[in-house]
UniProtKB/Swiss-Prot annotation:
Expression sites (tissue/organ): Expressed in roots, cauline leaf epidermal cells, stomata, stamen, pollen and around the base of siliques.
Protein name: Sterol 3-beta-glucosyltransferase UGT80A2
Knockout consequences: Reduced growth rates.
Transmembrane segments: none
Biased composition (Polar residues): 67-79
Family assignment from sequence similarity: Belongs to the glycosyltransferase 28 family.
Pfam families on file: EryCIII-like_C (PF06722), Glyco_transf_28 (PF03033)
Gene that encodes the chain: UGT80A2
Keywords per UniProt: Glycosyltransferase, Lipid biosynthesis, Lipid metabolism, Steroid biosynthesis, Steroid metabolism, Sterol biosynthesis, Sterol metabolism, Transferase
Catalytic activity: a sterol + UDP-alpha-D-glucose = a sterol 3-beta-D-glucoside + UDP + H(+)
Organism, as annotated: Arabidopsis thaliana (Mouse-ear cress)
Length: 637
């Protein structure tokens, strides 16, 4: 299958009438140090699904990326150093002059230094607002290539040290103390509003927003949850108003599993991606202003809550002149503490840059559709590709729905960003389990849960055989969730295995001794809350991120990528989870998370960042000059 350059990807995207990518793509980067003589610079090779760690580029764009996440505007670029500093010590000079190296070697080293310096400058120019859009595309095409398997190869020097991060913690634009705790926000302060939630993804992506919507509704607000038609019954049963968004989560999930991310593995894959994204993007505006499809009651949104995969949400908010608040279950704001979950970068100096690279590659696939929406539907001017006009930085508030006991808020995230806690939806209290399931659970020891939710499994029969054999070898009982993947087709029934369809995790997991799953944020949260040691088998997207966090916290083994799933690894993982120390660590973490109320935290964060009460909610919301930034296209701060 042919490789695809960013320029070719952009060309196909622009000429196609279809749409781009989904929430849980993966871009990974392999970083290697290349030897090339005494003074040669290291080179970062980004391959195997886009990651990135150009230390040099991080040094050159640190001011810009800090501005984006902290709300400060600084467009200055530091000088990119890829060669030894001129101010080296006299002893270093003496040693250098006394070394008698062949002229050929010296020439080779100098050439490599020159090449790496050029690469660094090229990478830095991608984020320079003085460079034209066409030039930026050529630069990106020069240093990045989408490989046949949907991965990206990217080369830049890696010898620079990132600049220290300075976060402005002054007063926010809405008159709220920048570091004011969300616990101090008055929930009764905001008058009733009509709020629309624009949510794209699987059932696990939608569920926490159902919990938040119900809480907002309790405070007197009208909440419309706009998501895929597949989840209409789920939303209506929760007592919420539903509006259909485009896109089919089954198709999106199947594409992501096949391609290991949002980058297409070949030209034939691009239309699949784009058809889905076009349907999503063009359904956002109607969701904000069209009458209720069932009752016909009129609706006009006063505010938007969205997740990043609802590409186009910020543009709709701009057109309607209403505030928007982005919530997500995985990091989407640049930080130097860990890389973008859709990337893999080992060196900390590349963590921040990984967010820029992931955004730029997503933007390649959707910019024509977004601009078409802006011109034809929103009556706005087009967005410049990879615009560096950060201005005062994005002021879009972000709320991250995970426990700070699992992943604390990074120190370089500014006042517009909150870590609110996991957002649980109570499904257990109204659940009536089948008598057969209750009898099986009571007939023996607590089982181990194994399931991969709504993700399609490539070889379900083989995976089922591995699961059953691993349970038998470790002498454990197991519950297999068949899900969308078709697990559980046993050749013959097993007394120690129980097969089930959907069961609320908050009911089932407290009755299990350990869990094995794909690593979705919601499933991970439910397992940890139930004190269950956890093994994560990531398929794509943010799942490896959660697998690594679980392992780092000591409550589970190293994640097992689905392509490496084997009897030996699953057996080792089960034995790891059965260790008393691991169980104790899981209980300690669950105890720390016990008093968290992520739903209340999300509601308070939403209220905290709304315009001041002195400003009418229907008044235009001032937007920073950086609205045309490519980062803004994804709702990134």
């Amino acid at each position: 299958m042919p490789e695809i350059s960013p320029a070719e990807l952009a060309k196909v995207s622009s000429s196609s009438s279809s749409s781009s990518s989904s929430s849980s793509g993966r871009a990974s980067v392999k970083i290697e140090e290349i030897e090339g003589g005494a003074a040669a610079s290291g080179v970062v090779i980004v391959s195997e699904e886009l990651e990135t760690n150009p230390k040099t580029v991080v040094a050159s764009i640190a001011d810009e990326t800090v501005a984006e996440s902290s709300g400060t505007g600084n467009k200055s670029f530091s000088r990119v150093w890829t060669m030894p500093l001129e101010g080296s010590s006299s002893s270093d000079k003496a040693e250098s002059s006394s070394t008698n190296q062949p002229r050929l070697d010296k020439s080779k080293t100098e050439r490599q230094q020159k090449v790496t310096h050029i690469l660094a400058e090229d990478a830095a120019k991608i984020f320079d607002d003085k460079i034209s859009a066409g030039k930026k595309l050529k630069l990106l095409n020069r240093i990045a290539t989408v490989k046949h398997d949907g991965t990206v190869e990217f080369e830049v020097p890696a010898d620079a040290i990132p600049q220290p991060i300075v976060v402005d913690r002054g007063e926010s634009k809405n008159g709220v103390c920048a570091d004011e705790s969300i616990d101090g926000v008055d929930l009764q302060y905001i008058p009733p509003m009509q709020i629309v939630m624009l949510i794209v993804g699987t059932r696990g992506d939608v569920q926490p927003f159902v919990a938040i919507a119900k809480r907002l509704q309790d405070y007197g607000h009208r909440v419309r949850l706009a998501t895929h038609a597949n989840f209409k019954e789920f939303v209506l049963t929760a007592g919420l108003e539903f509006y259909p968004l485009g896109g089919d989560p089954k198709v999106l999930a199947g594409y992501m599993v096949k391609n290991k991310g949002f980058l297409p593995s070949g030209p034939s894959e691009i239309p699949i991606q784009r058809n889905q994204m076009k349907d999503i993007i063009y359904s956002l505006l109607p969701a904000c202003k069209e009458p209720d499809p069932d009752s016909g009651i009129s609706f006009k949104a006063d505010a938007i809550i969205a997740n990043p995969p609802a590409y186009g949400h910020t543009h709709v908010a701009e057109a309607l002149k209403i505030p928007i608040h982005v919530f997500f279950t995985m990091p989407w704001t640049p930080t130097s503490e860990f890389p973008h979950p859709l990337s893999r970068v080992k060196q900390p100096a590349g963590y921040r840059l990984s967010y820029q690279i992931v955004d730029s590659l997503i933007w390649l696939g959707i910019r024509d559709m977004v601009n078409d929406l802006r011109k034809k539907k929103l009556k706005l001017r087009p967005v410049t590709y990879l615009s560096g006009t950060q201005g005062s930085g994005s002021n879009i508030p972000h709320g991250y729905m995970w426990s700070p006991h699992l992943v604390p808020k990074p120190k370089d995230w500014g006042p517009q960003i909150d870590v609110v806690g996991f957002c649980y939806l109570d499904l257990a209290s109204n659940y009536e389990p089948p008598a057969e399931l209750v009898e099986w659970l009571e007939a023996g020891d607590k089982p181990i849960y194994i399931g991969f939710g709504s993700l399609p499994v490539q070889e379900p029969e083989k995976m089922t055989e591995i699961i059953v054999e691993a349970l038998q070898r470790t002498k454990q009982r197991g519950i297999i969730n068949k899900g969308w993947g078709g697990l559980g087709n046993l050749k013959e029934p097993k007394d120690f295995v129980y097969l089930l369809d959907n069961v609320p995790h908050d009911w089932l997991f407290p009755r299990c001794k350990a869990v094995v799953h794909h690593g979705g944020a919601g499933t991970t949260a439910a397992g940890l809350k139930a004190s269950c040691p956890t093994t994560i088998v990531p398929f794509f997207g943010d799942q490896p991120f959660w697998g690594e966090r679980v392992h780092a916290r000591g409550v589970g083994p190293s994640p097992i990528p689905v392509d490496e799933f084997s009897l030996h690894k699953l057996e080792d993982a089960i034995n790891f989870m059965l260790d008393d120390k691991v169980k104790s660590s899981a209980e300690t973490l669950a105890k720390a998370m016990k008093d968290e109320d992520g739903v209340a935290g999300a509601v308070k964060a939403f209220f905290k960042h709304l315009p001041s009460a002195k400003q009418n909610i229907s008044d235009p919301i001032p937007e920073p000059s950086g609205f045309l930034s490519f980062r803004k296209c994804f709702g990134c701060s």
